[in-house]
From Swiss-Prot:
CDD domains documented for this protein: Peptidase_M17
Source organism of this protein record: Synechocystis sp. (strain ATCC 27184 / PCC 6803 / Kazusa)
EC number: 3.4.11.1, 3.4.11.10
Top-level class of the enzyme under EC nomenclature: hydrolase
Organism placement in taxonomy: Bacteria, Bacillati, Cyanobacteriota, Cyanophyceae, Synechococcales
Descriptive protein name: Probable cytosol aminopeptidase
Length: 492
């Protein structure tokens, strides 16, 4: 399928299906729409009136057009209130159009939607991402896939002019999102710690990245007792992956760290019935997004040096598993009383944060499916953002808005660290039930000295049980697009 920008407008374009977007209560047939309605033999007005189309968010219609017109089908999508129009709304509109076109077996599609911030290039990129993400099909594990081959061969973005650069950029970003989606969607017998190394190796070889993989012995030499404590029970060897994109003259040096638990049984504090243990293949969502971001950024080639870090292992049960009550020593010398083996992700991140800071980076972002408490607080669509550095937090919020992904900044309430204090170690790995996502962030903060750092809890948005905007049911690839936009923003 080819996506391209064009100077043709809805008034001049010819093809199988024309898609139009309307804001809520702005569906009057006036001006250019009058000419378009005449061109379509009155179908536009008739469709809006008969179906009571008001342009509300999520509203969509499709209709055949008279055989004498240059358009065979007409697709209408509602964009909601104009005051709430943003990148997410635009991308979701493109996704809705793409799915309708697929269902109608359209071959050539013309898309006419409002521009984002009067910027044709930005608009073309958002539309491209929305279309490609909506049409992505992951049928790897089906013997007889229900989704049939997509008939769509050409999508033209109307009125935006030639936008090959913006479209190409979006396609590269989407390739990273799809890598993350497919890693998270795959079961734990398909994506193991060793699979992480294989994927990182392929990225390094394909895009000229530097790769360092530390095994058990190397991690022991660095004193990574927190990471290795989690890894003890698994028969699969731990893999500490350090992938580097290094341009010739970087203006910034950053680290992105993803929690990479390829399966989380809970350890000896095993996840019981009704806990969703069968979904714990996605506990490596942060690591999948980290490698997805690496794939996109390596193709986009910004002048920013980035270190991608994944401490990959499983949290399993065996005779060698860490016990509740064990004391682990992290690589910065701090001791941790393990009062819950099911709070293991923060232990792996602790050593990864220490490792990243020693690289001399200027900012660190970690992302993790860390706490159910964050889902309770923010639901399934919004990720939590914690940072003691407001400048970094603001950069990430701007990037998320541009990417069409949602984050909400949460408090770093230092008083809550009282709940993590241990009588026999420097800290416990979990605190009281209340404020659990905040105490998790405060725990991670103990492994950062001075470097600007942000923590993203992505436990909710990494997966969706049903179609949601640009995402189909399953893994979303969140927040690859935010990470990429953050890096690109610093490269400007």
């Amino acid at each position: 399928m080819q996506i391209r920008g064009t100077d043709y407008t809805a008034l001049t374009w010819q093809g199988d299906a024309l898609a139009l977007g309307f804001f809520e209560n702005a569906t009057e047939i006036t001006g250019d729409l009058t000419q378009l309605d005449d061109r379509l033999e009155g179908v536009l007005r008739e469709l809006i009136e008969e179906k009571e189309f008001k342009g509300k968010a999520g509203q969509k219609l499709v209709s055949r057009v008279g055989s004498k017109t240059p358009i065979k089908k007409l697709i209408l999508v509602g964009l909601g209130e104009i005051e709430k129009f943003n990148s997410q709304v635009l991308g979701d509109g493109a996704a809705a159009i793409a799915r309708l076109a697929k269902g109608e077996k359209v071959k050539t599609l013309g898309v006419s939607l409002p521009q984002r911030e009067h910027d044709p290039a930005q608009t073309a990129a958002i539309l491209t991402e929305g279309i490609l993400l909506a049409l992505h099909q992951d049928n790897r594990f089906k013997s007889d896939p229900e989704d049939k081959e997509i008939k769509l061969t050409t999508v033209e973005l109307l009125g935006l002019g030639e936008q090959s650069t913006a479209i190409g950029k979006a396609e590269k970003i989407v390739s990273g999102v799809i890598l993350a989606r497919e890693m998270v969607a795959a079961p734990a017998n398909e994506v193991t710690p060793l699979t992480f190394t294989e994927i990182a190796t392929e990225l390094a070889q394909t895009y000229g990245l530097e790769l360092e993989v530390l095994g058990q012995t190397e991690c022991e030499a660095l004193g990574m007792g927190a990471f290795l404590g989690v890894a003890k029970a698994s028969e699969l060897p731990p893999q500490f992956i350090h992938l580097t994109y290094r341009p010739a003259n970087p203006v910034k040096k950053l680290a992105i760290i993803g929690k990479s638990l390829t399966f989380d049984s809970g350890g000896l504090n095993i996840k019981g019935a009704g806990s969703g243990i069968e979904t714990m293949k996605m506990d490596m969502g942060g690591g999948g997004a980290t490698l997805g971001a690496a794939k996109a950024i390596a193709q986009l080639k910004p002048n920013v040096e980035i270190h991608f870090i994944c401490a990959a292992t499983e949290n399993m049960i065996s005779g060698t598993a860490m016990h509740p009550g064990d004391i682990l020593t992290a690589s910065n010398g701090k001791t941790i009383e393990v009062n819950n083996t099911d709070a293991e992700g923060r232990l792996t991140l602790a050593d990864a944060l220490v490792f990243a800071e020693k690289l001399g980076v200027e900012a660190i972002v970690d992302l993790a499916t860390l706490t159910g408490a964050c889902i309770v607080a923010l639901g399934d669509d919004i990720g939590g953002l914690w940072s003691p550095n407001q400048e970094l937090a603001d950069e990430l919020k701007v990037a998320a808005d541009k990417a069409g992904e949602k984050f909400w900044q949460m408090p770093m309430e230092s008083k809550y660290f009282e709940g993590l204090k241990s009588p026999i170690a420097d800290m416990k790995n979990t605190g009281p039930r209340s404020g659990g996502s905040i105490t998790a962030a405060l725990f991670l903060q103990q492994f950062i000295k001075e470097t600007p750092w942000a923590h993203l809890d992505i436990a909710g948005p990494v997966w969706t049980d049903k179609q949601n905007g640009v995402h189909n049911a399953g893994a979303t690839g969140y927040p690859v697009r935010t990470l990429v936009q953050w890096v690109l923003g610093l490269a400007e």
